[in-house]
């Protein structure tokens, strides 16, 4: 692994806790000026590469994130792609996994890292996790192998010394520094005294010379139905058969199981008959959908429900937005859902 003197990283601050510090005058948190990042994190100045910054205006609370942000991010990375060796996106933690998943599908053929990070405590607080997260993310974004290629040319989340594939990651804790976890895929890298890269898991481009393709068309007409004991036919019908959606993600029990009651299967068939795509993902934080194990899962498969395998809900949603934005054809979308596009599922 090496860094070159010509390496340059673009730090993109969208909003979130990491960029806040206390204003002694008003005695409240406010965003600091990221053009002065070396004053807040002087350790970055010790690296042999340049770190530039770009700040969104206005800043976006992660609870207010919309797909329009993802399009803006993709357009910014596309515009600056030739100017930088890697990109670090500072983002609020609540929807970071959604944004990282979305960018992974929107950028095809990445040859440079796009690393999302943030913090649980503001960077201006003494015990902040923000500095370590930022330093690790920048170092990984700048890291190259002996051939001068990026060590991790993927969209990732770097948090609490662990680098995870973005579309495999979920936020699992609201008050712990280990806020994110990738249950179905081991880390791509871990930062200790040294940064250890799991090169056997990292996805590399078919061509290092080819420019990535940026897909910015998204169709967000997706609903999510979370199964639970006592759910009523009317609630299921409103979500499955509502005219506003083109697709429905069903969060099922265990290995992809759902009620085998006739009314439920009839509503599945009705929704599919309307031309909708239905995707089965598990409510479990680890494991995979397998609709061949139990009769309750096989009913869904026989009806025409697509398997999400071991996809996270965040990744499944972003993937549907991407596929539906690419084509109005339900069969195209369904086939794409059951295809591993960016390392988001294991089959």
Would you name each region that the model predicts?
Residues 252-347:
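C-terminal non-catalytic interaction/assembly regions of soluble proteins
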Residues 20-21, 95-100, 130-134, 257-260:
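Short glycine/serine/threonine-rich phosphate/pyrophosphate-binding segments
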Residues 116-193:
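Internal gly/pro-rich beta-alpha loop/helix module
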Residues 2-6, 12-16, 33-45, 165-255, ...:
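Accessory alpha-helical/coil subdomains and C-terminal extensions
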Residues 16-19, 91-97, 163, 254-257, ...:
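Gly/Ser/Thr-rich loops at beta-strand to alpha-helix junctions
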Residues 1-79:
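ATP/NTP phosphate-donor binding region
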Residues 12-14, 89-91, 115-118, 153-160, ...:
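Short beta-strand segments
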Residues 89-112, 260-267, 296:
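Short Gly/Thr/Asp-enriched flexible loops that form oxyanion-binding sites at enzyme active sites
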